[in-house]
């Protein structure tokens, strides 16, 4: 039973050993309150940093969110999606009781579906390093088409929420939480970091990328005007010129979307110009 639960493994010599030895163990509990697995974290710099229970008859990591059993009891419908167990634990200790995280995997469609059942808003609170930012971008794409409002947390002066809360305290984190970015703002902020805006060529490259992001996003004409103003202010390029290029890009994106839709209809054999002959027999 211990082997099938994933708590122990058998060595090459046939001896059983504890796979979580020298680690802090974190119980993973399902929404009904049953312990179904464990995560184990080292307390030094040894690798791997985390070890998780293998999948069993009752534990499917792609369908499980750590601490959802606690978060679902909260009156708040704003969930905070973290990168690791320790971030979640720190948040709960500080009173943010809707913090959850995936269990040793990247976010999965099944976990997104779980969130839609309990949350109205999801704040992505991943690490501030490059890997965390890439994970944020991947996760944002997975929420496309859901009814959830998604925001992105920027953690200044710390590598993750756990470090930020321990360094600056709960109130500072609450203030940061209230200043989250929309997915569009996150993408634009990520784009501008890639360019030296003092360089003419890079400034134009940034404008092209930013306009591509805006043209591919479902935003109102008013919002496009606001973002065009920000791009103009960042780059020193006339706002009217930015708007002209943006409107051209929006029209181009619309044409491409219509062509893609028509091609898909044609592929399925139900394009508007296809008619099935009437069989008089």
Tell where the protein language model's regions lie, with residue ranges:
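Phosphate-handling DNA/RNA-contact segment within nucleic-acid enzymes
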Residues: 1-118, 122, 135-136
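A charged alpha-helical hairpin associated with nucleic-acid processing machineries
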Residues: 30-32, 71-79, 106-122, 127-281
């Amino acid at each position: 039973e211990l082997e099938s639960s994933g708590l122990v493994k058998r060595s090459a010599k046939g001896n059983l050993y504890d796979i979580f030895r020298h680690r802090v163990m974190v119980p993973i509990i399902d929404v009904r309150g049953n312990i179904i697995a464990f995560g184990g974290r080292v307390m030094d710099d040894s690798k791997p940093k985390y070890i998780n229970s293998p999948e069993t008859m009752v534990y499917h990591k792609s369908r499980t969110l750590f601490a959802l059993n606690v978060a679902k009891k909260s009156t708040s419908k704003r969930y905070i999606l973290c990168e690791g167990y320790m971030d979640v634990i720190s948040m709960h200790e500080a009173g943010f009781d809707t913090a959850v995280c995936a269990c040793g995997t990247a976010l999965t469609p099944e976990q997104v579906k779980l969130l839609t059942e309990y949350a109205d808003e999801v704040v992505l609170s991943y690490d501030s390093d490059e890997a965390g930012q890439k994970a944020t971008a991947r996760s944002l794409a997975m929420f496309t088409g859901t009814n959830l409002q998604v925001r992105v947390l920027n953690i200044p002066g710390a590598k993750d929420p756990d470090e930020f809360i321990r360094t600056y305290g709960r109130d500072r984190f609450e203030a940061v939480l209230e200043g989250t970015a929309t997915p569009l703002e996150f993408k634009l902020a990520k784009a501008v970091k890639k360019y030296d805006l003092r360089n003419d060529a890079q400034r134009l490259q940034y404008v092209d990328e930013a306009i591509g992001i805006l043209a591919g996003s479902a935003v109102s004409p008013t919002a496009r005007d606001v973002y065009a103003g920000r791009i103009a202010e960042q780059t020193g390029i006339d706002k009217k010129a930015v708007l002209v290029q943006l409107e051209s890009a929006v029209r181009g994106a619309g044409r491409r979307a219509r062509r893609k839709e028509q091609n898909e209809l044609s592929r399925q054999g139900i394009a508007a110009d296809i008619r099935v002959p009437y069989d008089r027999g």
